[in-house]
From Swiss-Prot:
Protein name: Holliday junction resolvase RecU
Localisation per UniProt entry: Cytoplasm
Reactions performed catalytically: Endonucleolytic cleavage at a junction such as a reciprocal single-stranded crossover between two homologous DNA duplexes (Holliday junction)
Required cofactor names: Mg(2+)
Main localization (coarse): cytoplasm
Lineage: Bacteria, Bacillati, Bacillota, Bacilli, Bacillales
UniProt family annotation: Belongs to the RecU family.
Species of the source: Staphylococcus carnosus (strain TM300)
Family matches, as InterPro entries: Resolv_RecU, Restrct_endonuc-II-like, tRNA_endonuc-like_dom_sf
Listed EC numbers: 3.1.21.10
Phosphoprotein keyword on record: no
Region (Disordered): 1-25
Cited function: Endonuclease that resolves Holliday junction intermediates in genetic recombination. Cleaves mobile four-strand junctions by introducing symmetrical nicks in paired strands. Promotes annealing of linear ssDNA with homologous dsDNA. Required for DNA repair, homologous recombination and chromosome segregation.
């Protein structure tokens, strides 16, 4: 993917590619108070139940500080702390493709703050991308009730811009142009694999 004049190259694909369809497709199955994590969990359960994909949330690492042994056969954790995850939130297999992604939501109406992303997560996504895996972010604008899949390649541009202290966030318009809108529906709630299909198609056309 090329970035002429230092800006992301926004492909104007056919209608099966990325399109700005967030206005026309907003069927009100909506968020209904659910967190993005819960919506992804329900969707992943559905994918698994129909044999479409095996995608799970990675467990949050825990550092155990104090353990007592009231009985020889039974240990009791007295003190423990959640550690910062070293990779992304989710991974799995879909149609022979390795999927790896981070999920974030924001109440901001106009942009996604990049301070919500950690350097080690970006390095992990880069490594996945270099091994031909599919790495991306799922970003939910909570107030707008809109969810987007932002592929790693355009995200990398925005991340470098952030590191250079040019801009600390990605505007919602930049995400709409460089990402894939995921409308809510009945089953699954958040059919993000449909957006993954579009991403796979676009990347295969780029390699031709």
């Amino acid at each position: 993917m090329n970035y002429p004049n230092g800006k992301p190259f926004n492909r104007n694909k056919t209608k099966v590619g990325r399109t700005n369809d967030h206005k026309s497709s907003k069927i009100k199955y909506g968020g209904r108070g659910m967190t993005l994590e819960k919506e992804i969990e329900l969707s992943n359960d559905y994918y698994l139940s129909i044999g479409k994909a095996v995608i799970h949330k990675k467990p949050t690492p825990v550092q155990i500080v104090d353990v007592s042994y009231p009985k020889r056969s039974k240990a009791v954790i007295k003190e423990a702390y959640f550690r910062t995850p070293s990779t992304t939130d989710y991974n799995g297999i879909y149609n022979g493709y390795y999927i790896d992604f981070e999920a974030k939501e924001t109440k901001n109406k106009t942009s996604f703050p990049l301070q919500n992303i950690h350097e080690h997560q970006v390095m992990h996504m880069k490594a996945v991308h270099e091994q031909k895996g599919i790495a991306f972010l799922l970003i939910r604008f909570k107030t707008l009730d809109e969810v987007y899949l932002l592929p790693y390649v355009p995200f990398e541009y925005f991340w470098k811009r952030y590191q250079q202290e040019i801009k600390k966030s990605i505007t919602v318009e930049e995400i709409r142009k460089n990402g894939y809108h995921i409308p809510y529906q009945y089953q699954p709630r958040l059919n993000y694999l449909k957006a993954v299909n579009k991403l796979i198609l676009d990347e295969s056309e780029d390699r031709v």
